[in-house]
């Protein structure tokens, strides 16, 4: 980075404990690209994340037992699954083990007690990967709504 003040802010921010111990790898790569490469990369990335966000919101609105609002500035969706008869942590385990889709649970461990009943979905991926993940998530939710899930 050509600007020492900006570079130091990035270094300082990376030392702050977040969900997994600092700034995510995705955020670090995006920051480097934004600061050292070309603005066109950032514009393309933002466009892709916005398209993925809009697609995911459209899909989620048709799924049972979930609620999700349009975020203003992030690469994740925070989905309310509190209508399910289980914790977010239990749901993410079922989703991962039985439906082979990974989502991050809310809860005191990472996001504070007010985040229980929510899951996070990452939008910073290809449309194809997002579509497949949403297909699997939808199947898990439909099966849970119809009591077709083991465990």
Regions found by a protein language model. Give the residues of each.
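Conserved core segment of the aminotransferase class I/II
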Residues: 1-50, 57-59, 141
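PLP-dependent enzyme catalytic core of the Aspartate aminotransferase-like
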Residues: 94-103, 109-151
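Flexible glycine-rich beta->alpha loop in the catalytic core of nucleotide-sugar glycosyltransferases
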Residues: 5, 108-109
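Short hydrophobic/aromatic beta-strand micro-patches
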Residues: 1, 78-80, 122-124
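Conserved glycine-rich beta-strand-loop-beta hairpin in the small C-terminal domain of fold type I
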Residues: 32, 48-57, 68-81, 91, ...
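Surface-exposed helix-capping loop/turn segments at secondary-structure junctions
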Residues: 40, 60-69, 145-149
């Amino acid at each position: 980075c050509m600007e020492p003040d900006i570079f130091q802010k990035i270094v300082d921010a990376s030392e702050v404990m977040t969900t997994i111990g600092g700034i995510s790898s995705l955020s670090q790569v995006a920051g480097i690209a934004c600061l050292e490469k070309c603005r066109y990369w950032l514009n393309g990335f933002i466009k892709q994340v916005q398209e993925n966000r809009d697609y995911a919101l459209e899909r989620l609105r048709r799924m049972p037992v979930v609620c999700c609002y349009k975020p203003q500035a992030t690469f994740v969706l925070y989905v309310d699954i509190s209508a399910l008869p289980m914790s977010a942590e239990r749901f993410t385990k079922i989703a991962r083990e039985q439906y082979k889709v990974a989502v991050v649970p809310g809860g005191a461990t990472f996001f504070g007690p007010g985040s229980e009943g929510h899951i996070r979905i990452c939008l910073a991926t290809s449309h194809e990967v997002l579509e497949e993940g949403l297909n699997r998530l939808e199947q898990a939710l439909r099966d849970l709504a119809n009591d077709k899930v083991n465990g």
